[in-house]
Amino acid sequence: MSTILVLHGPNLNMLGTREPEVYGHETLADIDDRLRSKAAEKGHHLLHLQSNAEYELIERVHEARAEGVDFIIINPAAFTHTSVALRDAMLASGIPFIEVHLSNVHAREPFRHHSYFSDIAEGVICGLGSQGYDLALKAALQRIHR
């Protein structure tokens, strides 16, 4: 059994109510429950954490390394464009990851076009709403089984 960690960055706790025209009506709990169920169906364990605090996400990445987490799916949200520290934690962990964004960041404000994570990620999925998480989980499981 492999372990996958899903990390959600700032403001994602507001899913379902925050700008639903951009982010959709599904809540973060809906997404996490669906992912956990899909992972369990395949015989894997899925953990998740949402935090508005950069240091909590960094500490969780450090813990993931010590726990032997096999893969990370991360939506760094606003930290995508600002967090060198979280990028460094991802690199230091050595855990492969996929970057996910609910909206198409390339069709939004120019400051959202740059990511500190894309060049070190296994892949990037954006603009597909919560389905992006499902696709990331599918890809993560395929990579784990290689």
Swiss-Prot record:
Pathway: Metabolic intermediate biosynthesis; chorismate biosynthesis; chorismate from D-erythrose 4-phosphate and phosphoenolpyruvate: step 3/7. InterPro entries: DHquinase_II (IPR001874), DHquinase_II_CS (IPR018509), DHquinase_II_sf (IPR036441). The record marks R18 as: Transition state stabilizer. PROSITE patterns: DEHYDROQUINASE_II (PS01029). Its EC number is 4.2.1.10. Keywords: Amino-acid biosynthesis, Aromatic amino acid biosynthesis, Lyase. The active site is at Y23, H101. It is an enzyme of class 4 (lyase). GO terms for molecular function: 3-dehydroquinate dehydratase activity. CDD domains: DHQase_II (cd00466). The keyword Amino-acid biosynthesis applies. It comes from the Bacteria. SUPFAM superfamilies: Type II 3-dehydroquinate dehydratase (SSF52304). It catalyses: 3-dehydroquinate = 3-dehydroshikimate + H2O. GO terms for biological process: amino acid biosynthetic process; aromatic amino acid family biosynthetic process; chorismate biosynthetic process; quinate catabolic process. Pfam families: DHquinase_II (PF01220). Substrate binds at N75, H81, D88, L102, S103, R112. Belongs to the type-II 3-dehydroquinase family. Catalyzes a trans-dehydration via an enolate intermediate. Homododecamer. This is 3-dehydroquinate dehydratase. It comes from Marinobacter nauticus (strain ATCC 700491 / DSM 11845 / VT8).
